[in-house]
Each structure stands twice: as structure tokens, then as C-alpha cells.
Design a protein with these regions (language model features):
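An acidic-aromatic loop/edge-strand motif
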Residues: 21-37, 48-52, 118-161
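Aromatic-lined ligand-binding clefts that engage carbohydrates, nucleic acids, or primary amines
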Residues: 36, 45, 66, 72-98, ...
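Carbohydrate-binding surface patches
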Residues: 62, 505-552, 556-563, 598-606
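Boundary/entry segment of secreted carbohydrate-active catalytic domains
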Residues: 156-197, 201-203, 208
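Substrate-binding cleft and catalytic face of glycoside hydrolase catalytic domains
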Residues: 200-389
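Acidic, Ser/Thr/Pro-rich beta/coil linker or hinge segments at domain junctions
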Residues: 285, 540, 545-595
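Glycoside hydrolase catalytic-domain groove-lining segments
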Residues: 378-430, 443, 453-454
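Aromatic/acidic polysaccharide-binding cleft in carbohydrate-active enzymes
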Residues: 420-520, 524-528
Length: 611
């Protein structure tokens, strides 16, 4: 799948151009994990090279026994870190000498370090299982890249220092990775599902499609309200212990002005639709489950909505917004109303600042409308998928810049909410493995948290289909945690007070926090590269630890290619301690860890219970 996307190139990763040495690979469209074994007999397989194209379903395999050459592009390899840069199909997993080394997708290609200190003539057995797509259909595939390179030794061999100082407190730690989003409702609303969401720390939950089935026809043709679906969701939120972000959508079929099976017609009668919204908000209050957050519609800027004759999308949206906020505030004067829930960033098409689809038109359009009319805008919402963390941070900053032109609205806005965000808007194997999890951690630390976004909502909460099919869910249909769910748990297991934490480069991001009462300290470290990420050696050094940590213990929890990873091992998909290190003295403590690319580690010092 080819995707034109903004990417960050990891500066300094490869210091020597990639080798043009012709490499031969054995290839098969069959699938067996035995193919990763160095001693597997592949003599009957087809021999191919870069540029090979084929069509198949499921998975395909490449194998090669690579001999380290004397030189790569005229540079001696002896003693150098020698790597293989690889990209093929939608993604895949790379094996070195029979063991999983790394996974990749085609927008985040792999770097396989064959040797940290190469010896010419050294033989390394490499196998790659490539993903042909998350479904059972046939897809076209190609071997796009397989080339040797010399890797910057500073990245592979040298220790990267992360320092923390609990004596320097920076205020409350933002609890940003505590929201979910689900379109079209959950597959179920049972107690077990509520319990798993509660256990990982979910505090807000955005849902759309809440009004689609709220109006029913009686046998005599009259209409009635049906709150059964809404009640089910409200009761579920209470069991989870979280706030509902009520996305006012979609149009009930009896209210259509024009037939539209996608439920995106404007209403036949604006007052009639306003009464529905009022009754929904009043119903929430009357049953003792008032809703604080009311978001007006979903991705209106994409052009899905059918407009009244002679109207443009923005006029239709601001009219709908007025109908909704007046209805909600009539039922509950304390409720918050927000929008515009745009798809993609706050820019229009072909804007050099970033991606978007009528984004600036709708973002500014709503702000200007509220500035002129006095309509409330309590929180601002938008959606984003896949973009690098730098783009995500820039989006939030751009929206705040727009607000400077609307001073009355700026005073109203209390929060920013990305009511849908995820690794990709398409089905992708990265949703099921550690790539999506590490991307999410990086996006959270360097994107949303860095920009002050209070309420990101991960899309999707739970898969609709059984098994692993590349769907967006944080959990499978069977309530098994994917790696991203374990990363969410890591974030919500951190202590409440942020402390000084230094240690960041293009790949590594980190954050630390303290519980002043117990003295427990937590550190979260992410290794994620947009392209060609090597493993990194991380030295964590702590000073001024609380005295209660004398003779304590440092516990390490890990999400990577082989740990807490449902894709790799369904029997060991839960987050667990991978290593314990004694803390002899709180005066000074350090520990060395090695993090592969696409990995997230939570380090907990002190305390007897884990996440």
C-alpha cells in the first residue's frame, strides 16, 4: 500500500551511503515460522532480488545468508556496526539467526543490525516474514529495499543517558492517555469489558452514532423516542467510571430531508432535530447520568453531509451547531459544547503547513461564528491518524494560534480534545503489534502532551471482528490487550507529580514522575524511529531519590517485539515485570537497559505492587 505522508528522517542514523552490493534472496509465498530457522532448507525456493514483484495473500517469506563484505561503498567494515535496511510490502518481521529482531511497516522501514562490530566474512542468517495485508485477499507485493549500510556507532554502541531528579518537581503529571473513542458503538457493554477499561485507567470515552436509532416509527406512522441504546452506553460509562463525550450524531432516518443511507442528511425540520437533542440531554439529566461534554457531529469537513439547496458545508454546520448548543444548554446549563470534530489537521488541502481537508475553513469558521454570535465553544475537537508527532504537536499549536484572532472565543475555550487518533485510518498489522504501540507512546509524549492537549481519545476501544485482523481496537473482540493497551496501562501507572527528566534525541523520549507520599518513582522511556531505528543502550541515572527507596527495588515492564505482545505470543500478552534490580542506596542509582526499536519501558522504583 503506497501512502504519501510526511515523515521525519532520523538525522545521523546512517553515516555511510547504503551499499549497492547485489543481494540475492530466496522467496516463498507459503507461511511457516520454521522458515526463520537458519538450517531450514530453502533450496527449492525462487531466487529473487530487489524489485521482485508478486501477488499473494497472507504472508510471504524472504531468506538470505549474508556475508559481511570487506567494504561498503569504499568504507572498511571491520569493527563497524553493519546493518541491513529493509522494506517490502505492508510490513513484516525480521529474524536474525532464527530469532525475532524487529518488526516494521512500509512507512517505517526496518534497520537490522547484523553486527555491532563487524568481521569481514562473518555470516549472518536473515529471514523476513512480510505482511501481504491484514485480510485474506490477495495483494500485490514488491521487495523495495534490501541494502547494507554502516550505522553510526554512537547510536548502536554508546550508552544514551537519561537522568531524573525527584528533587525537582514540575507539577502534576498530565493524565493524557486515558481516553477512548468508538464509532458505531461497542460490540458489547458487559461487565468484563467495563472492567478492563477501568483497570487500565480510562477516564473519558467519546462515542458517536448516539442518536441514529433514537427515533422510531409507530405502527400508525407517528414517531417516538427510543433511549435504549443511549441508556446502555450511559450505564456502561458509569461502570467504567469515566466521562462520556457525547458526539451528537447521526441523523435518524425519519428526520431525513433527503434519503441518505449513511445518515448524513440535513434534518427535514431543524426545530424537530433540536427537540431530539434537548430530550436526549434532558433524559441524561433526569436519569442521574448527566453528560458534561457534547460534541457537535463528526468529520463534517469531509463533505459527507447533504446540504440544503444553495448552502455550503460550513453554513450547514454552523446552523446545526446553533441548534445543538441551544438544545443542550436548555436541558443542562452546565454542559459543555464543542466541535468542529474535523477530520485531519487544521489546514486546507495542499497547505504547506500540514495535512488537512477544509480544516482551516471549518476550524476558523466555527471560531468566527461563535465570536460573532456569542455561541459557546467550551472545547475544540479534531481527529488525526498516522502523522509524525511533530505534525500532531504543530496541529494543536496552530489551533491555538487561530484563537488569537477571536479573543472572546479564546476566553471560553477550556480544553482541547482529539476525539479520534490512532496509528492509521485503514486496517494495518501495526495496530496489532508493537509498532502501533510505540508510535502511540511517542505521539502522546512528543505530540499531545507537549502541546497541552487534555483529552486525546484512542480510536478504537475494541475490535468488532475476532482474532487479529489489523483493526484499530486497543483490545480484541475477546478482551485481549494489544500492545497499545499495555502502553496505555503504563502511562496510567505513573506517579502523580512530574519530575525533572533529561534524555531525548530523534529516537528516544522519556518522562518521569513521583508519588510524594510513598516516595515511589516511575520513568517511562520510548524508543521509536520514523525510519531505520536501531536498538539503543539506555543508562538511567537517578539522583536525590527519596530515602524510602533505600534497599528498595527497581522493577522494569516492557512492551516490544517479544514482551507483552499479543501478536508475538497470545499466552503472554499481559504487562508483567521483565527484570528487577535492587536499589542499594537512594543517594545514587543507575541501571542499564537495552531497548529495541519500537519499544516502551516503564521503570518503577519502590513499592510492592506493579501496574
Amino acid at each position: 500500500m503506497t501512502r504519501l505522508l510526511a515523515v521525519i528522517f532520523l538525522l545521523g542514523l546512517v553515516t555511510v551511503p547504503a551499499s549497492a552490493i547485489s543481494m540475492k534472496w530466496k522467496f516463498s509465498t507459503q507461511d511457516s515460522r520454521d522458515f526463520a530457522r537458519p538450517d531450514f532448507d530453502d533450496s527449492s525456493w525462487q531466487e529473487v532480488a530487489v524489485g521482485h514483484k508478486w501477488k499473494s495473500a497472507g504472508f510471504a517469506w524472504f531468506r538470505s545468508s549474508i556475508t559481511i563484505p570487506d567494504e561498503i561503498d569504499g568504507n572498511p567494515t571491520i569493527g563497524q556496526a553493519v546493518g541491513l535496511r529493509w522494506n517490502a510490502c505492508d510490513g513484516g518481521e525480521c529474524y536474525v539467526d532464527g530469532e525475532v529482531y524487529t518488526r516494521y511497516d512500509n512507512d517505517h522501514p526496518a534497520l537490522v543490525v547484523l553486527s555491532e562490530s563487524a568481521k569481514p566474512g562473518e555470516l549472518v542468517h536473515v529471514a523476513v516474514r512480510v505482511f501481504m495485508g491484514p485480510d485474506t485477499a490477495e495483494h500485490e507485493g514488491s521487495l523495495g529495499q534490501a541494502e547494507l549500510c554502516i550505522v553510526d556507532p554512537k547510536l548502536v554502541k554508546d550508552e544514551f543517558l537519561v537522568t531524573i531528579d525527584p528533587g525537582k518537581r514540575l507539577g502534576p503529571l498530565p493524565r493524557s492517555f486515558a481516553g477512548l473513542s468508538q464509532g458505531a458503538g461497542l460490540p458489547d457493554y458487559d461487565d468484563a469489558t467495563a472492567a478492563i477499561f477501568r483497570s487500565i485507567g480510562i477516564k473519558w470515552f467519546r462515542m458517536d452514532n448516539l442518536l441514529t436509532n433514537a427515533v422510531k416509527k409507530n405502527d400508525d406512522g407517528t414517531l417516538r423516542y427510543d433511549w435504549s441504546d443511549l441508556d446502555k452506553r450511559l450505564d456502561f460509562m458509569k461502570k467504567v467510571g469515566c466521562e462520556l463525550i457525547f458526539c451528537i450524531s447521526y441523523m435518524p432516518e425519519p428526520f431525513d430531508a433527503v434519503p441518505n443511507p449513511e445518515r448524513h442528511s440535513y434534518p427535514r425540520d431543524w426545530n424537530e432535530f433540536g427537540e431530539l437533542v434537548y430530550q436526549a440531554a434532558k433524559h441524561c439529566v433526569d436519569r442521574g447520568t448527566p453528560v458534561k461534554y457534547w460534541e457537535v457531529w463528526n468529520e463534517f469537513n469531509t463533505g459527507w453531509m447533504v446540504d440544503p439547496a444553495g448552502w455550503d458545508h460550513l453554513k450547514t454546520y454552523t446552523t446545526l451547531y446553533d441548534v445543538c448548543w441551544k438544545a443542550v444548554r436548555k436541558a443542562d446549563p452546565t454542559a459543555w459544547v464543542g466541535g468542529p470534530a474535523i477530520a485531519s489537521g487544521p489546514w486546507n488541502e495542499n497547505d504547506p503547513r500540514g495535512p488537512g481537508v477544509n480544516g482551516e475553513e471549518f476550524m476558523r469558521g466555527l471560531m468566527e461564528h461563535c465570536e460573532k454570535t456569542g455561541a459557546p465553544l467550551d472545547f475544540i475537537t479534531w481527529h488525526e491518524y498516522f502523522q509524525p508527532h511533530s505534525i500532531m504537536k504543530k496541529e494543536a499549536e496552530q489551533i491555538k494560534e487561530y484563537l488569537n484572532d477571536y479573543p472572546k472565543v479564546k476566553k471560553q475555550v477550556k480544553e482541547y480534545a482529539v476525539t479520534e487518533w490512532s496509528y492509521a485510518w485503514w486496517h494495518d498489522r501495526a495496530h496489532d503489534n508493537e509498532i502501533g504501540a510505540a508510535w502511540a507512546a511517542t505521539s502522546m509524549l512528543r505530540g499531545w502532551m507537549a502541546a497541552g492537549v487534555q483529552k486525546p481519545c484512542w480510536f478504537l476501544a475494541k475490535d468488532f471482528s475476532s482474532g487479529l485482523q489489523g483493526e484499530w481496537g486497543m483490545f480484541t473482540r475477546e478482551n485481549k490487550p494489544k500492545p497499545v493497551a499495555n502502553v496505555c496501562r503504563m502511562f496510567n501507572s505513573m506517579m502523580p507529580i512530574r519530575i525533572e527528566c533529561k534524555g531525548e534525541d530523534e529516537q528516544i523520549a522519556s518522562i518521569a514522575s513521583l508519588d510524594p507520599d510513598s516516595g515511589r518513582v516511575t520513568v517511562l522511556i520510548v524508543n521509536f524511529a520514523e525510519r531505520y531505528g536501531p536498538p539503543r543502550k539506555i543508562r538511567l541515572s537517578a539522583m536525590n531519590l527519596p530515602s524510602s527507596l533505600d534497599n528498595g527495588v527497581c522493577r522494569q515492564y516492557l512492551v516490544d517485539a517479544t514482551h507483552a505482545n499479543l501478536w508475538h505470543d497470545p499466552a503472554r500478552c499481559e504487562l508483567s515485570v521483565v527484570r528487577e534490580v535492587p536499589i542499594v542506596s537512594a543517594n545514587a542509582f543507575d541501571t542499564l537497559v537495552e531497548l529495541s526499536n519500537n519499544s516502551v519501558m516503564l521503570i518503577e522504583m519502590g513499592g510492592n505492587s506493579g501496574p
